[in-house]
């Protein structure tokens, strides 16, 4: 039986340097993540993951919030280094003292090591305590001049495999305006101006996924013209969203009830985009009218 290799990244560094953004970034590229874990629990988590089929990638934040446990860190790191079933790296996030002070002032949070409330004293003590760990780190990132978006991009580029690059996902969603706009939509397109199959009794109880309705909607000249323009708008901008570090882009297409026109349009768009992107297709309100009729 082939031995399972776990890819482990221990995220550590100065408080305020961006560890929260970092751990969210690892989650976006498919890592199992745990924040603020006591070092003594790291081997136990790895042992559990060895017997799981869910993932072989894990990112853990270990920092001075767990100071009571932090004395164990060197022994734990030695164990990890000697484990042949681990591909193990340390990511250390740093920033200048001035930048860290500025971030603490902005958030109005107290430093975990500033007993008397003086942020700079806490930073200096933390820097001293973390110095040995920083020297062991294979990856040291200075976030002083990085925006959260730039940090996410840096982590994605450094720790994503080629397969992970497909972590950018497009959600194509149809909906009915009468039931409200999707709250998570990034782009919304309105197709209520197109001829409505609802007024044809033979099509009323069907949906945009049925061939009769799909053909009715998509064979009108207005539909063809609009779909062509929609493609010309959407396809060129997708690489830009991916480049900016967005993990999910939701494209919503709406008609009145979300049963006919929007379903047909969203389905065609999703099928076309699947040629080049990872796409999920959802029809939020497709069966809502049927369910309402059945309840009555």
Curated annotation (Swiss-Prot):
The keyword Nucleotide-binding applies. GTP binds at residues 63-66. Signal peptide: none annotated. Keywords: ATP-binding, GTP-binding, Nucleotide-binding. One of its GO terms (molecular function) is GTP binding. ATP binds at residues 13-20. InterPro entries: P-loop_NTPase, RapZ-like, RapZ-like_N, RapZ_C. Pfam families: PapZ_C, RapZ-like_N. Belongs to the RapZ-like family. Displays ATPase and GTPase activities. This is Nucleotide-binding protein stu0831. It comes from Streptococcus thermophilus (strain ATCC BAA-250 / LMG 18311). The lineage of its organism: Bacteria, Bacillati, Bacillota, Bacilli, Lactobacillales.
């Amino acid at each position: 039986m082939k031995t399972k290799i776990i890819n482990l990244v221990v995220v550590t560094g100065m408080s305020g340097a961006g560890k929260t953004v970092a751990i969210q970034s690892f989650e976006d590229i498919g890592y199992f993540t745990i924040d603020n874990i006591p070092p003594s629990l790291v081997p136990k988590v790895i042992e559990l993951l060895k017997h799981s089929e869910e993932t072989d990638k894990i990112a853990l934040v270990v920092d001075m919030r767990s100071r009571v446990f932090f004395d164990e860190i060197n022994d734990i790191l030695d164990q990890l280094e000697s484990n042949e079933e681990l591909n193990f790296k340390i990511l250390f996030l740093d920033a200048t003292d001035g930048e860290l002070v500025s971030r603490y002032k902005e958030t109005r949070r107290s430093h975990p090591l500033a007993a008397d409330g003086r942020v700079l004293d806490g930073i200096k003590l933390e820097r001293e305590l973390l110095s040995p760990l920083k020297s062991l780190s294979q990856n040291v990132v200075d976030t002083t001049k990085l925006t959260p978006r730039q940090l996410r991009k840096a982590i994605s580029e450094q720790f994503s495999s080629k397969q992970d690059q497909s972590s950018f996902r497009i959600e194509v969603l149809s909906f009915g305006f009468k039931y409200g706009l999707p709250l998570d939509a990034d782009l919304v397109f309105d197709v209520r101006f197109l001829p409505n199959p609802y007024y044809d009794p033979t099509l009323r109880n069907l949906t945009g996924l049925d061939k009769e309705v799909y053909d009715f909607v998509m064979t009108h000249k207005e539909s063809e013209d609009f779909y062509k323009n929609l493609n010309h708008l959407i396809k060129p901008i997708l690489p830009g969203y991916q480049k900016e570090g967005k993990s999910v882009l939701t494209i919503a297409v709406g008609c009145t009830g979300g049963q006919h026109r929007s379903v047909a349009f969203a389905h065609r768009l999703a099928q076309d985009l699947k040629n080049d992107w990872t796409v999920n297709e959802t029809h939020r309100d497709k069966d809502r009218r049927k369910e309402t009729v059945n309840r009555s």
